[in-house]
From Swiss-Prot:
Residues 124-156 are annotated as: Disordered. Residues 136-145 have a biased composition (Basic and acidic residues). HAMAP family: Ribosomal_bS16 (MF_00385). Residues 124-135 have a biased composition (Low complexity). This is Small ribosomal subunit protein bS16. Keywords: Ribonucleoprotein, Ribosomal protein. It comes from Bifidobacterium animalis subsp. lactis (strain AD011).
Amino acid sequence: MATKIRLKRMGKKFYAVYRVVVMDSRTKRDGRAIEEIGLYNPNTQPSTIEIKSDRAQYWLGVGAQPTDQVLNLLKITGDWQKFKGLKGAEGTLKTAAAKPEAAVLVEEAENKAQKLKAAKAEAAAKAAEAETPAEVQHDDEKVELADVEESAPESV
């Protein structure tokens, strides 16, 4: 039986997700698979490629032929180089940066909020400090005006 390692289309319209499967070469594209050995999602950044290396090595070893698209995926993951005994068996797969945990994000947001509150309080304190001498000067002027009015003779 001639077997192929190829892609089986899954997902919605305009959002294709593929499974890397081993099938008889005469079956339909989305027909029954002998074994599913991986997943390929080209919609994420970077594309998600998950292939079970040991199963891919087994099927390549027993003569399964990869399609061109699957061959490119196997080269990216390094499975093809490992099978052929070539250099670069680690592949060129780039992993996405790890996302920080939710607790770390919450803690950073709280620290940022506390810094903002402290800055606002400090600005308010400086503004209050700047206003206080000005008010005192105005009060002195009012007191002086009141003294002048009291000492002035009453006009009839």
